Amino acid sequence: MLAVRSLQHLSTVVLITAYGLVLVWYTVFGASPLHRCIYAVRPTGTNNDTALVWMKMNQTLLFLGAPTHPPNGGWRNHAHICYANLIAGRVVPFQVPPDAMNRRIMNVHEAVNCLETLWYTRVRLVVVGWFLYLAFVALHQRRCMFGVVSPAHKMVAPATYLLNYAGRIVSSVFLQYPYTKITRLLCELSVQRQNLVQLFETDPVTFLYHRPAIGVIVGCELMLRFVAVGLIVGTAFISRGACAITYPLFLTITTWCFVSTIGLTELYCILRRGPAPKNADKAAAPGRSKGLSGVCGRCCSIILSGIAVRLCYIAVVAGVVLVALHYEQEIQRRLFDV
């Protein structure tokens, strides 16, 4: 299970989540039915070589649409919703419209559902970026607890590993026998890791040359982070094409606000080098527990925090599943049906 301990990483996760929720809200509920689609039109009475013009639905104009089933099967996926607001061309009673009416009668040659484009490009990129960033956070936390970290004060003591406390409690309560193998293993790991960190800080190039696996792990961690942030920032630079006329100004402003905030937050986290705490040396050395109350307090706090985090995850996952099942048909109807 994943618990985001770093406030910097947590802020980025919250911003990405909020950005994705805003996009989903606009796609499902925020777009007006008259501003979901764009149409490639040509005024009635003009030559066939006249260039097509993309425009959104305008109630002051008369849009003559294609038949119910286009002869060449040229409709795009989910574009049928765009033809619901059109008038079939064969039911128009007049033969040749007057010149004054030509500018108000449009023949529709193609329709595009812009919500489909938004759903399958931006929303998907945000979701993929969100999962990649969570994968980066998971790898980073595991490396801080068990791997090589520089500077050394960023290391997390392996003894705080939840499995260590859980194994100790289970063995002492149910088995009535002290189990210390995990504790000894973590202590040995802590000593070896401190030696590796000293070697890495002395000569990083030689260290990574003789231990390429560590370099690969760190490289994968950095790649996940940069790819995730790149996908999120890239959503603001995706070409909207002709669909730009349907998207409101607030969506553009909201997109750039979220993207710039996420990018600046990550840049600040990367460039910022916080000073080492004054008691870093004391904290690095293993200290003795101050009596039974200190041991019980540490055990209870870590176990209860782990249980609370797992309960929160279960509640969030269950809530998302229930909401998705309850509103699945409604979401599909709003997106792709009439």
UniProtKB/Swiss-Prot annotation:
Cytoplasmic side: 141-212, 265-301
Post-translational modification: N-glycosylated.
Localization of this protein: Host cell membrane; Host endosome membrane; Host Golgi apparatus membrane
Primary residence: host cell
Entry keyword annotation includes 4Fe-4S: no
Gene: gK
Subunit: Interacts (via UL20 interaction region) with protein UL20 (via N-terminus); this interaction probably plays a role in the coordinate transport of protein UL20 and gK to the trans-Golgi network (TGN), and is required for the cell surface expression of gK.
Pfam families named among the record's database cross-references: Fusion_gly_K
Species: Human herpesvirus 1 (strain 17)
Glycosylation-annotated residues: 48, 58
Protein name (database record): Envelope glycoprotein K
Family recorded in the similarity comment: Belongs to the alphaherpesvirinae glycoprotein K family.
UniProt GO cellular component terms: host cell endosome membrane; host cell Golgi membrane; host cell plasma membrane; membrane
Region (Interaction with UL20): 265-301
Location of the region described as Involved in fusion in the Swiss-Prot/TrEMBL record: 31-121
Described purpose of this protein according to its UniProt entry: Glycoprotein that probably modulates membrane fusion events during secondary envelopment of cytoplasmic capsids that bud into specific trans-Golgi network (TGN)-derived membranes. Also plays a role, together with gB, in virus-induced cell-to-cell fusion (syncytia formation). Seems to block fusion of virions with infected-cell membranes.
Keyword Transmembrane: yes
Gene Ontology BP annotations: fusion of viral membrane with host outer nuclear membrane; symbiont-mediated induction of syncytium formation
Superkingdom as given in the UniProt entry: Viruses
Alphabetical list of InterPro entries matching this protein: GK
Membrane-protein topology: Multi-pass membrane protein
Residues spanning the membrane: 122-140, 213-233, 244-264, 302-322
Signal peptide: 1-30
Extracellular face of the membrane: 31-121, 234-243, 323-338
